[in-house]
Design a protein with these regions (language model features):
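Cytosolic C-terminal regulatory domains/tails of membrane transporters and channels
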Residues: 2-6, 371-374
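Helix-loop-helix hairpins and the membrane-proximal interhelical loops
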Residues: 4-63, 67, 188-251
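Membrane-helix interfacial "entry" motifs
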Residues: 8-15, 19, 47, 51-55, ...
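Alpha-helical transmembrane segments of multi-pass membrane proteins, especially transporters
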Residues: 23, 27, 54-58, 66, ...
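Transmembrane alpha-helical segments of multi-pass membrane transport proteins and ion-pumping complexes
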Residues: 27-39, 43, 62-63, 67-71, ...
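Juxtamembrane and boundary regions of transmembrane helices in multi-pass small-molecule transporters
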Residues: 28-31, 113-182, 214-221, 302-381
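Juxtamembrane helix-loop transition segments at the membrane interface in multi-pass membrane proteins
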Residues: 43-46, 85, 116-128, 224-236, ...
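Membrane-interfacial helix-loop connectors
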Residues: 70-104, 117-119, 153, 165-166, ...
């Protein structure tokens, strides 16, 4: 009896370590898949997306341009870089600010796509979709509050202008050297693009997007099964301590992780399966998501300090606008109990609707990221 128990223990331990190794590989696969989707969008639409910025004739149009461009390119950092270049080329800062706000909303489409990996299980999908869309609702609420204030009083422009002078630096403080994700994903993506280039950039880009989405489904499905068996007892408590210990701790954790991985969409996408499988609750990841919003601004700010010459002040000012906007939005919305609950209620409501009717998901994505901005751009043009 004792011998059998002794033999079983190493087997159980080995199996558990294999599961952890498999989970780590699936995590890498998810990171790779998100990078594939982003790279595919950029490859297929990158140059065309820049044309969108020519339609900036009104702050609302600027907001929609930032939203659509980021949803297409799948990188708020890239869109912010384009905006910096446009400001340096003569675009007024007050016109660029709504674009930065739009970029905040556009970057949230990635985690919504990741949540679809749970679509086969109703309970998991409800939790995952709520976790994904809480980011959307927070950013939409932030824009509803701050865009009118900016149009009337120019508060973000004034604050960023006041802050920009002391932060001018001649040294290179770029964060590019700390990008941990790109080195482990770019070789695979480069190899895939090498194979798909024969179909042309647009078709190849679309194929890379489809392959990325399919990989997300595979990674999420396997991760879900593994996490259900692994995230119990002590492991679950450690994770909750790391993310859900308290609002300030969650915001700080989200900021640090996002600075390290250089992508808020990657950070928030990694939370979706954890909520979907019941390891964490939507309320646990809410502050973490707000931290991700701030973290992506810090990355852009530090990168902007590497810009030298006559346009350095513009790079810093736009980066500071992004940071100031997200910090003020976090303080105001999360600090006021009534406002704090609105993104949660909105996310839970649409998740309930999406669980009952999957067409709601398509309707939501099309409405927020295509129909609404497209219609507004057509009217303002």
């Amino acid at each position: 009896m004792n011998q059998a128990t002794t033999t079983a223990a190493p087997i159980a331990s080995t199996t558990r370590w294999l599961r952890w190794a498999n989970l780590a590989f699936m995590l890498y696969l998810l990171l790779l898949a998100v990078a594939m989707v982003g790279s595919g969008f950029k490859w297929a639409t990158g140059d065309q997306a820049k044309v969108l910025f020519e339609f900036a004739s009104h702050p609302i149009a600027g907001l929609m341009i930032g939203l659509v461009a980021t949803a297409l390119i799948q990188s708020s950092s890239t869109v912010t870089s384009i905006i910096v270049g446009l400001v340096a080329g003569g675009l007024p800062v007050e016109m660029a600010i709504p674009m930065v706000m739009g970029a905040n909303i556009g970057t949230t489409v990635t985690n919504t796509l990741v949540s679809l990996g749970h679509v086969r299980c109703q309970v998991e999908f409800k939790r995952a979709f709520a976790s994904a869309t809480i980011h959307d609702f927070f950013n939409l609420l932030a824009v509803l509050i701050f865009l009118p204030l900016e149009m009337m009083f120019g508060i973000l422009e004034k604050i960023s202008h006041w802050l920009v002078s002391p932060l001018l630096s001649t040294g290179d403080m770029s964060m590019k050297g700390l990008d941990f994700i790109k080195p482990i994903t770019s070789p695979i993506i480069t190899a895939l693009k090498g194979q798909l280039i024969t179909f042309g950039e647009v078709v190849g880009g679309v194929m890379l997007i489809v392959l990325g989405i399919a990989t997300i489904f595979v990674a999420i499905t396997v991760m879900g099964k593994l996490m259900k068996s692994l995230m119990v007892g002590r492991a679950k408590e450690i994770l909750k301590d790391a993310i859900g210990r308290g609002p300030l701790h969650g915001i700080l954790s989200g900021s640090i992780v996002t600075v390290l991985v250089q992508s808020s969409s990657t950070t928030t996408s990694l939370m979706v399966p954890l909520v979907g499988t019941g390891v964490l609750k939507v309320r646990d990841v809410y502050p973490f998501t707000l931290g991700a919003n701030i973290g992506t601004c810090i990355t852009a700010l530090l990168a902007a300090t590497a810009v030298s010459g006559e346009f350095a002040v513009f790079a810093l000012q736009i980066a500071l606008v992004h940071l100031t906007f997200n910090v003020l939005a976090t303080v105001l919305i999360y600090g006021v109990p009534f406002l704090r609950e609105l993104p949660i209620k909105g996310a839970e409501m649409i998740a309930e609707m999406a669980t009952k009717n999957k067409a709601v998901v398509a309707g939501y994505l099309l409405s927020v990221f295509i129909i609404m901005p497209g219609g507004i751009l057509a009217l303002t043009a």
